[in-house]
């Protein structure tokens, strides 16, 4: 069947997050601000492109909240109750997303949402409670390695009891398969057990170290370290566990292969991965240049996070920036819109870019300043400043939504296969997690139950540069 870029997408997932992925409320804020910016653009320079900013999948927080409430209802029926949002103490006043989540939960009839540190949980008459009120469900915004570290500093017996009682989302049983080495499972001999969709969107991946391996084309690699030296421009090194792009080294971007390889070997627990061509997950976006006092077209890398639960897609988080694109590494966020006009995504993007480029610098600068003010008003900040936000939306089609729903169903199903293989001992060689953490995982198996998962996609929906 001929590939149709209007109804399918190109690219690969760079990683999965089965632990405690975020972004579900940040995209809501981004959509609201992005729609306000878009309305301003239309009044000045209308590109003649009909875009939908209000599709439910562009607001993933609501599906996430519905899932948490459903978990509560499954335990407590129609009785009112408290859903706890548990986060590290130092983040409680700064992480807007968790503050907002507690508010969204409290807006549901009969539900109280409360944000707290894990050591604020207590046992009252043997029940996991917060300030004397029993807790029905917990969203825990950190992984089990952090839980274990905090338990060693505080007595987190109430939190661990909640794990045993199955009250914690995500279930701690996802943690052993929440490591980047799982991509070697997909791209190695065990790949036959998984969906073709998952396998073809997984870049070649191998745990890094002194070992032999099969290469991207099935060739025998006798010395993986030497292979990395010889082919560095086309490879990436990443910690098996990590976030915000910390410790990642990308061939061709980080040119010193020796530094990258020595870092990976000294730290340990790294993966070696095939680099996805940068142009495939790049797009050109208008921006203001305050130094030159001009409107410029800049090329950014993109990141398309799919957020899902047991019922399917919750929605997306769209990011842009350099390599990597994480906000913690200087990246930003981008609104998302569904194309309703009868044209290709490429034509729509070109029209929107041209319309924005035709706006006078002073007018566009004023729009950007208002955009930043709206971000500050929403406490949408990182290190005290507004999070960077693209001027124009990323554009997809209804056909892309269908393709992404299919892709996420495969990811969910294949995650269940991974957990089953882990419980059977088939993945022991791929998982380097300490014994106590594995014991926590065994307290609360996942088994396909309520959870929020994320896939970070380096995708093209048809607007990637053709000259890169």
Short names for language-model regions:
Residues 1-468:
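Preference for protein termini
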């Amino acid at each position: 069947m001929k590939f149709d870029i209007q109804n399918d997408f190109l690219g690969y997932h760079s990683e999965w997050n089965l632990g405690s992925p975020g972004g579900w409320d940040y995209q809501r804020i981004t959509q609201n601000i992005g729609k306000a910016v878009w309305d301003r653009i239309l009044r000045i320079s209308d590109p003649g492109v009909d875009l939908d900013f209000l599709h439910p999948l562009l607001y993933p927080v609501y599906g996430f909240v519905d899932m948490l409430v459903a978990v509560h209802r499954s335990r407590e029926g129609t009785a009112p109750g408290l859903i706890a949002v548990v986060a590290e103490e130092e983040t409680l006043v700064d992480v807007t997303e968790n503050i907002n989540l507690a508010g969204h939960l409290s807006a549901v009839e009969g539900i109280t949402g409360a944000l707290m540190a894990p050591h604020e949980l207590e046992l009252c008459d043997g029940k996991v409670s917060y300030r004397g009120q029993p807790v029905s469900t917990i969203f825990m915004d950190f992984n089990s390695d952090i839980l274990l570290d905090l338990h060693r500093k505080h007595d987190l017996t109430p939190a661990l009891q909640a794990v045993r009682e199955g009250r914690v989302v995500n279930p701690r049983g996802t943690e052993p398969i929440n490591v980047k080495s799982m991509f070697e499972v997909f791209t190695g001999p065990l790949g036959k057990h998984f969906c073709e969709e998952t396998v073809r969107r997984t870049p070649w991946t191998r745990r890094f170290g002194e070992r032999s391996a099969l290469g991207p084309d099935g060739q025998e690699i006798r010395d993986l370290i030497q292979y990395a030296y010889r082919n560095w421009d086309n490879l990436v090194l990443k910690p098996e566990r990590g976030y915000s792009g910390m410790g990642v080294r990308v061939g061709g971007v980080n040119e010193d292969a020796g530094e990258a390889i020595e870092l990976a070997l000294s730290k340990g627990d790294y993966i070696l991965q095939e680099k996805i061509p940068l142009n495939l997950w790049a797009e050109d976006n208008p921006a203001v240049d305050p130094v030159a006092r001009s409107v410029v077209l800049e090329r950014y890398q993109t990141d398309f996070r799919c957020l899902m639960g047991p019922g399917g897609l919750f929605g997306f988080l769209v990011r842009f920036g350099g390599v990597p694109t994480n906000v913690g590494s200087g990246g930003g966020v981008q609104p998302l819109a569904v194309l309703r006009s009868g044209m290709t995504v490429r034509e729509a993007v070109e029209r929107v870019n041209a319309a924005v480029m035709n706006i006078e610098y002073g007018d566009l600068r004023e729009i950007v300043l208002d955009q930043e003010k709206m971000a500050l008003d929403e406490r949408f900040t990182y290190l005290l400043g507004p999070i960077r936000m693209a001027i124009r939306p990323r554009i997809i089609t209804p056909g892309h939504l269908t393709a992404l729903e299919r892709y996420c169903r495969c990811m969910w199903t294949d995650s269940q296969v991974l957990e089953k293989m882990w419980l059977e001992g088939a993945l022991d060689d791929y998982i380097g997690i300490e014994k106590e953490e594995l014991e926590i995982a065994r307290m609360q198996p996942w088994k396909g139950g309520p959870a929020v998962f994320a896939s970070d996609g380096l995708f093209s929906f048809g607007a990637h540069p053709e000259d890169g």
